Amino acid sequence: MTDPLAFRVMNEIGIIDQLGSTLFERSMPRGLTLPQFVVLNHFTRVGGDRSPVELANAIQVTKATMTSTLQRLERKGFVTSAPDATDGRSKRITITASGRKARDQSIKAIAHHLAALETAIGKKQLEAVLPVLAALRIFLDRQRDGD
């Protein structure tokens, strides 16, 4: 019996995620972990500030895990935290210029792998798959949020 098409697609994406994460972790600048990069990349992609809970939900980790990651990033000067103006119990986290630089350096560190991928698969094929992947992400985001 053949597995359902959607399962096979998700299975491939999961394997790609594991392989890509391993490759990325091996190439990251010293002292930066993949979870820390993910937070920096999230800020770069969406902009603005976020609460630790908002970040934990967006990245699909526990609040405790996010708090630990944010503390490490703050010690490195990659994010800042300030009291929430509307809710004094919460904090608002913002990426710093150093955080953006660390994120950009991480991408530069894997540039040769990205170039090899583009050569092996082809720019046109990668461009063709990108809208499908974006649609999958949007669908899964809505499922996560209960829409």
Functional labels for PLM-detected ranges:
Residues M1-R30, K76:
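N-terminal leader segment of winged-helix/HTH proteins
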Residues G14, N41-G47, I107, A134:
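Short, locally clustered residues in the helix-turn-helix/winged-helix DNA-binding domain
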Residues M1, K123-D147:
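C-terminal regulatory/oligomerization modules of transcriptional regulators
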Residues T22-T65:
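N-terminal helix-turn-helix DNA-binding core of bacterial DNA-binding proteins
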Residues Q71-P131:
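Charged, amphipathic alpha-helical coiled-coil/dimerization segments
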